[in-house]
């Protein structure tokens, strides 16, 4: 086994953050280092990378040395080779930093055990160095893993209420506001592509949010799934807590809907692959109803995927938006199918982080948000729903995802 026996507390609590039943990043992929001579005097354990991951890093380090020799001989690098060289350089720098911090920890550990006169000072340095070392280890694992195929893409978020009636619609609006707040916090450009409110205007029936920042998909893809809220509705007279849900779909944004000609979109599909229906926009009546045939419905015949768009008064703009969403849905569908085939080929037993079950609970009475995939809990609902502390939840899930992908990589080897 590549995992040594270790002991960790079942739950660690720090500034309102809980790490529950899921183990922290690297633990299941590493051996925990302890020193039996210390008699418990060493304040914090640290974890070493799996030998298989270290071997992979050493392989990249050796490849970089070969490329350095080529450069010193005046061999020209094309654009792709320059990018590969830059990637290897960044990875090797992190690997060197990892080894340096690991050696420092081992030296301090030995000092704590063997030199009582320096023990107090060494223990303090040791405790300060462990989290720095773990952060470096996490960065190294992320660099060793293959990137997500759409990691550099902008993103589209589709939000729809689930069970819970009006309360689910209100919660869907809360989630939309959270993602807008998060985009503002990250200083990302965004646009609401479509938003359909319910009759009372208190919630939304569906919405599509475009995050135009390159790489935002890699960050937000962990938001895909069913979100659950537990709270007392304003209309509840007996003080009972109600449970409602909303579904979030996160897609990579493929193409540029600001293109001057819609022909560019249609040329990406074979003749007869797309059925385009033009119709009059529907709405609440009065000024909300368009008097021209501007609404567009696209049907991708091979897959049966249908996209309708009527938010713009211009048929051209609605068609462009519809093609953008259709291409994003098709790209995500193909990626998921490919992942499923690879998973079956490896006979992997690792659960997918893209499951469409309840991924997260927002509990208002307890001021608690819990991500059920990685066991992360944060006691600050207003901070998360404002978008300002959503990064902490996403980061916990990102680390868990890295752990699972690294585990798959090791098992496949």
Curated annotation (Swiss-Prot):
One Pfam family of this chain: RF-1
GO terms for MF: translation release factor activity
Ranges for region Disordered: 335-363
Record's keyword terms, sorted: Methylation, Mitochondrion, Protein biosynthesis, Transit peptide
Locations listed in the record: Mitochondrion
Chief site of localization: mitochondrion
Misc remark: Present with 414 molecules/cell in log phase SD medium.
PROSITE patterns registered for this protein in UniProt: RF_PROK_I
Protein modification: Methylation of glutamine in the GGQ triplet is conserved from bacteria to mammals. N5-methylated on Gln-287 by MTQ1.
Function (record text): Mitochondrial peptide chain release factor that directs the termination of translation in response to the peptide chain termination codons UAA and UAG.
Name assigned to this protein: Peptide chain release factor 1, mitochondrial
GO cellular component assignments: mitochondrion
GO BP term, example: translational termination
Family of the protein in this entry: Belongs to the prokaryotic/mitochondrial release factor family.
Superkingdom to which the source organism belongs: Eukaryota
Membrane-spanning segments: none
In-chain residues carrying the UniProt-annotated modification N5-methylglutamine: 287
Keyword Mitochondrion: yes
């Amino acid at each position: 086994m590549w995992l040594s026996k270790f002991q960790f507390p079942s739950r660690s609590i720090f500034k309102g953050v809980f790490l529950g039943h899921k183990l922290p990043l690297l633990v299941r992929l590493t051996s925990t280092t302890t020193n039996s001579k210390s008699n418990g005097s060493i304040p914090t354990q640290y974890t070493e990378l799996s030998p298989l991951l270290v071997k992979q890093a050493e392989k990249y380090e050796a490849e970089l040395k070969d490329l350095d020799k080529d450069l010193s001989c005046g061999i020209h690098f094309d654009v792709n080779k320059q990018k590969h060289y830059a990637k290897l350089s960044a990875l090797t720098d992190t690997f060197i930093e990892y080894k340096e911090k690991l050696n420092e920890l081992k030296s301090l550990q030995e000092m704590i055990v063997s030199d009582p006169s320096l023990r107090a000072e060494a223990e303090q340095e040791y405790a300060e160095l462990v989290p720095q070392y773990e952060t470096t280890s996490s960065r190294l694992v992320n660099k060793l893993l293959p990137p997500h195929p759409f990691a550099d893409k902008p993103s589209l978020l589709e939000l729809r209420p689930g069970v819970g009636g009006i309360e689910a619609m209100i919660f869907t609006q809360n989630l939309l506001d959270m993602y807008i707040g998060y985009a503002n916090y990250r200083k990302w450009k965004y646009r609401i592509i479509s938003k359909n409110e319910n009759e009372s205007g208190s919630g939304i029936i569906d919405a599509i949010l475009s995050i135009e920042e390159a790489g935002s998909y890699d960050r937000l893809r962990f938001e895909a799934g069913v979100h659950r809220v537990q709270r007392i509705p304003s209309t509840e007279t007996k003080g009972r807590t109600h449970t409602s849900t909303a579904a979030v779909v996160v897609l990579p944004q493929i193409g540029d809907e600001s293109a001057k000609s819609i022909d560019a979109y249609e040329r990406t599909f074979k003749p007869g692959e797309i059925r385009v229906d033009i119709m009059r926009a529907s709405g609440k009546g009065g000024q909300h109803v368009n008097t021209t045939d501007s609404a567009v419905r696209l049907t991708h015949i091979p897959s049966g995927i249908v996209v309708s768009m009527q938010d713009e008064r211009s048929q051209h703009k609605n068609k462009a938006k519809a093609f953008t969403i259709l291409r994003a849905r098709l790209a995500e569908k193909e990626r998921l199918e490919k992942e499923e085939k690879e998973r079956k080929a490896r006979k992997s037993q690792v659960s997918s982080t893209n499951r469409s079950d309840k991924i997260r609970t927002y509990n208002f009475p307890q001021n608690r948000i819990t991500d059920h995939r990685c066991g992360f809990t944060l006691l600050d609902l207003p901070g998360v729903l404002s978008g300002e502390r959503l990064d902490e939840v996403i980061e916990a899930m990102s680390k868990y995802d890295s752990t699972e992908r690294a585990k798959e990589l090791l098992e496949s080897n």
